[in-house]
Amino acid sequence: MNNILSEEVLNVTDFTTSRQLTLWKREDLQSSQLDDVAEEVPVALVYNGISHVVMMASPKDLTHFAMGFSLSEGIIDSPREIYGMDVVPSCNGLEVQIDLSSRRFMGLKARRRALAGRTGCGVCGVEQLNDIGKPVQPLPFSQTFNLGNLDRALKHLNDFQPTSKLTGCTHAAAWVMPSGELAGGHEDVGRHVALDKLLGRRAMEGEEWRQGAALVSSRASYEMVQKSAMCGVEILFAVSAATTLAVEVAERCNLTLVGFCKPGRATIYTHPQRLIAD
């Protein structure tokens, strides 16, 4: 398998679509004009020929999404357990066909569940309340971050949201280096998918992305915390608030959770010992 999209797939993965819409302004009469609308398509993750999950997502960076989802959902422990990926068109959307190691595939089949794909829904299809939440090993305390460098990251987060600038419809997730520089980022109509894309990219980048923190443009739900912890991320910054369950999970797994990140301020919910305040 390879990671190169065919021409046919590239033709359907434009990130926006122009549509004729009706615009209303208080001072004007209604008028019709073209405007940009964010693309949202069903994306099936198919492991060794068996469809495991269908999620609604932006049709871009799908191999990163597949890698991040596989890691954050505990399907694999290492990128080496995926031997290859292909993105191919299907009748109603796209498929990421994943060549998974035999050992991991057996484990996946043993706990396979059907997820009904809704935009960025992290618990869709969970059959019982007891299935919510995965056991996460407590994180080490090997990272620190100077909060004085957070403003730099926030200033450039929009650089990784070109579709949001056109449509106002996407979330972003970016990797913040200790200096505050953004090493890279991804956007998607679903906040969980954007984070999975980032986590997959981080795993594939290797040692260069070991140090630092994740920054998301959305709120921090418990799924965002859990996905980060499953991938070894020790610090999660969110532009918006955190939920009570997110705080509980972060406390339990030793993740430093920070919300309401704005220039010159932030709310630290858990494990502030990783943060340096200059």
Curated annotation (Swiss-Prot):
Q: Name one GO cellular component term.
A: cytoplasm
Protein name in the entry:
Sulfur carrier protein FdhD
What does the function comment of this entry state?
Required for formate dehydrogenase (FDH) activity. Acts as a sulfur carrier protein that transfers sulfur from IscS to the molybdenum cofactor prior to its insertion into FDH.
Q: Which GO terms describe its biological process?
A: Mo-molybdopterin cofactor biosynthetic process
UniProt cross-references to Gene3D superfamilies, sorted A to Z = 3.10.20.10, Cytidine Deaminase, domain 2
Entry's family note: Belongs to the FdhD family.
Entry annotated with the keyword Cytoplasm: yes
Mind listing the GO molecular function terms for this protein? sulfur carrier activity; sulfurtransferase activity
Q: Which domain of life is it from?
A: Bacteria
Tell where it localizes.
Cytoplasm
Q: Which NCBIfam families match?
A: fdhD_narQ
Q: Name one Pfam family in it.
A: FdhD-NarQ
Instruction: Tell me the InterPro entries matching this sequence.
Output: Cytidine_deaminase-like (IPR016193), FdhD (IPR003786)
Cytoplasm found in the keyword field: yes
| Binding residue positions for Mo-bis(molybdopterin guanine dinucleotide) | 260-265
Tell me which SUPFAM superfamilies the record gives.
Cytidine deaminase-like (SSF53927)
> Where are the active-site residues found?
121 (cysteine persulfide intermediate)
Q: What are the UniProt keywords, alphabetically?
A: Cytoplasm, Molybdenum cofactor biosynthesis
